[in-house]
Structures are given as structure tokens and as C-alpha cells.
Amino acid sequence: MIIMLSPAKNMKNIEVFDRDLSLPCFIDNTKEIVENIKTFAIEDFKNKMKINEKLAVLNKNRFESIKFDRLGNPAILTYDGIQYKNIEAENFTRKDEEFANSCIRIISGLYGVVKPYDSIYEYRLEMQTKLRVGEFKNLYEYWGNRIYKELIKEKTAIVNLSSNEYSKSIEKFIKDSDTYITCTFKVNKNGILKVESTQAKKARGMMTKYIVKNRIRDIEELKKFNLEGYKYKENLSNNSEYIFVKE
């Protein structure tokens, strides 16, 4: 079972991590994208990434500091969004880290696919950014089916715990013979079921932690997830979407 996660816009620097890190599988592609972005002026960052001047300066400096001559930090500890705060990877044991690295894959506009303990640098680059790379007019076109092929090579189920922006990068390549399941988290508001962005990110993080801590490799075991009031709803779910509702 492969767990597919989104990255996070917010990132943090890790002072000390004393375990070996691996390099992302598409590091040569990453270098190509970085060299492209290093030509950007501040205005390019602002316009293409839809960010303010302060963030544009920060990210220009981040990209200019990427040298690839030294290791960065572990991906799962560097991403700092709501989902990652609820994974709580800083509390993982060595066995947790090994299990997480075997099944979690983070989809990234810059790196393509990263394992939790791959080395990454701090950056900001959303998959939906209209960034031309060579002959490709955006990152979806640039990555093409490479992300899908990397995930599916394990010949096992893919569990989608990512946002639409990132799941979109592989869904058009999914075949009928593939086992691809999206976990959707909804809240019951006066009898109306809604996906609330913040709650969904939090739940995806909790589900990821639940999978790691319980060493889950069978998709049927996902249905037992019941943290913070969520319950699997058989009547709302199907073979490609597991729906969990918080009453």
C-alpha cells in the first residue's frame, strides 16, 4: 500500500537530524526546474506564484541557496502545514520512520515524488504554478506520467491522502486495473455533510499517523480509523472512495 500525500507551503529548518537521508528519485529533473527558477526576478516570483513581496524575496533567496552539494533536511520534518503537524513525525520511533519510508510518498511540483526521509531544501512551488520548463507549459505537463509510474511500480494499492491539486497529477493515468482509493473526510453540519479544508487536512494527517503507528498495509484496515469522532460510512463509500464523517 502506497500513501500519497501533498506537500505543504510552509516549511521549517531542522537543526539536527542524525540519520542518513536519501536523494529524491527525480533529482535531475529537480535540478532542471531549479536552474529555470534561478533566472526569476522578484516580480516573476510574485506573479507566477501569486505571493507578496516578502514571500517573493524569501523564496528567491531559498532557490538561490540551493546548491545540491550538500544534503538538506528530511521531507516529512521540513513540511510544516496542518497535515504534517498532525502526522507528528518528530515523535516517530526508528521503526516508525522505516515503515513510513516504505509506504509514504509526497507529491511535489519541484521534486516529483519524495519519500519521508529523502533530503529536500526549503522551497515554495505549487504544482498548479504556471511555470514553463523547456517545451512544457506547466508542471503537470512537465511531470507527465512519471509520478504515476513511480507510484504504481510497487504494484500495490495507492491511497490518496492528498489535495485535488496533487492527485490531479496522476489521476488521468490511473487504469481500471489499478487499485486507487481516495479517503474523503467530511463533517456533519446540521445534517449537511461538508468537506472543510482545515478539518480535512488535519484528518489526512491523523490518518497518515494512524497508518504508520498501526503498520497498516491492508486497505480494509483503513475503515477502522475513528480518531476525533470520524467514522467510516459504508453507505456513502465505494471501491474508489472511502468516506469518513465526523458527527
UniProtKB/Swiss-Prot annotation:
Cross-referenced InterPro entries: YaaA (IPR005583)
GO cellular component assignments: cytosol
Any one GO BP annotation for this protein: response to hydroperoxide
Lineage top rank: taxon: Bacteria
Pfam families: H2O2_YaaD
Species this chain originates from: Clostridioides difficile (strain 630) (Peptoclostridium difficile)
Family statement drawn from the similarity comment of this UniProt entry: Belongs to the UPF0246 family.
Protein name listed in UniProt: UPF0246 protein CD630_18230
